[in-house]
Amino acid sequence: MEEFRYDTQLLIEGADLDEDAINDYFRLHSKGDCLLTVGDEDLIKIHFHTNEPWKVLEYCASLGEIYDIVVEDMVRQSKGLHG
């Protein structure tokens, strides 16, 4: 069984986004793994496995507009079900 159930992915569009600061925030304030934050000051892609995807969305929405949001249940996927 997966330790972290939800594969959470999204884009953040904003101004003066800081990839390193976003990465540091998740490492310090969120439980999860497979964290990926890539982009530039205008657009950041987030990928994170967590049990609390709503917290990821809430934080990212505080930074700018969020879109292309995907939250997949990896436990369901491992059972051959739609995530």
Model-derived features with residue positions:
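N-terminal loops that bind phosphate or other acidic moieties
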Residues: M1-G83
